[in-house]
Amino acid sequence: MNVKAGSLAWLSRLNFCLADVRDGLGPFLGVFLMGHGWAADDIGYVMTLGGIAGMLATTPAGALTDAVRAKRLVVGLGSVLVVAGSLLLLISPGFAVTALSQVGTGIVGAIIGPAIAGLTLGIVGQQGLPAQLGRNEAWNHAGNVFSATLAGALGYYWGLPAVFVLMAVMAVASLLCLSRIRPGDIDHDVARGLDPQHAGGKPQTSTWRVLASSRPLMLLALAMMLFHLSNAAMLPLLGQSAVSRGGADPALYTALTVIVAQLVMIPTALLAGRFADRKGYWLLITIALTALPLRGMVAGVWDSPWALLPVQMLDGVGAGLLGVALPGAVARILQGSGHINIGLGAVTTIQSIGAAMSPALAGVVARHYGYGAAFAVLTGIALLALVVWAWLAERRDHAAGRAAVVAALK
């Protein structure tokens, strides 16, 4: 019997509970603010502030994960801070308070991601990472389905404030899960990506040279930046578009947009973990990048609330694959360097530039030219991401990238 089975079970449950916590209100933020009289571009601006804060925090967050052993504490404190910021927004949804809440959520979200990746790698090691990443993502998406279903029902009967209460409950459950993961099951040297022969040695300093010295990592970061510049605004924009036409209940429709995508993500993540274990991550990323422009075209052309079905099914494919492929690809590229978490943080920082700008860009276009034009712009960016990846990607240069990183950091 695997002596770490208990910790792995609680790690899965942790991913389930964090699904409703780590991103704050997520797509519910847009419809919540619209209910308080906010314009589409103002919503985009405040969401962009949160994205910028997260972008600036991701590389230090990766360095923190590489450096500290108290990864469980980092995740726990982050969960509490996200809920506190969201409850503050419920009390006073003015611009200053909303901006502060989103900045805090962005920073905490940047920290939780690498911390969970570090915990996972520290428990299962490189050999077990692809399959466990798939399980992590499947549990995370299942948690999103559960939370969105409950949030939609609660919001329908008691209004959007019920969503805030649900988030607080899930945060408490996350703390319980963290407390049941045994510290002794976490190898903190392996969690950083050190080779066994280097484990226990002098800690290496995490640095931006990790990104600059590896062409595969730079390519991955560029593709992800364009992907998120297109993707980040699509779900909030879909919800705002439907609500603005008066054809849908805000809480219920937003919940449905989440549920449809997450139901697709669960099997996608499980299959992606198994596929990556045998074939690697290149094809998974390619398929994810292909799904995004298709999603944007459907959303822009089909002016109906029912568009959420194909649009969010395609979102489930893209997000389900990347949730497994991105951390797995970074871990494989940087294996043995001792800088996996800072590498993941660096890639996340670059992609966050796109994610931070996406809501503001889409909000401005939607206000002045309509929602169809906004979806067209996002679709064009998605096609550019696919072109860049197809033009530059090389399947088998991970080893060369890892060697360049190790040499640069000696």
Features from the language model and the residues they span:
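Cytoplasmic helix-loop-helix junction between adjacent transmembrane helices
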Residues: 103-142
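Hydrophobic core of transmembrane alpha-helices in multi-pass small-molecule transporters
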Residues: 16, 85, 97-111, 307-321
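Helix-to-loop junctions at the C-terminal end of transmembrane segments
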Residues: 57-70, 268-280
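Loop-to-transmembrane helix entry
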Residues: 39-49, 247-263, 339-342
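Juxtamembrane intracellular "pre-TM" segments in multi-pass secondary transporters
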Residues: 1-5, 185-220, 405-410
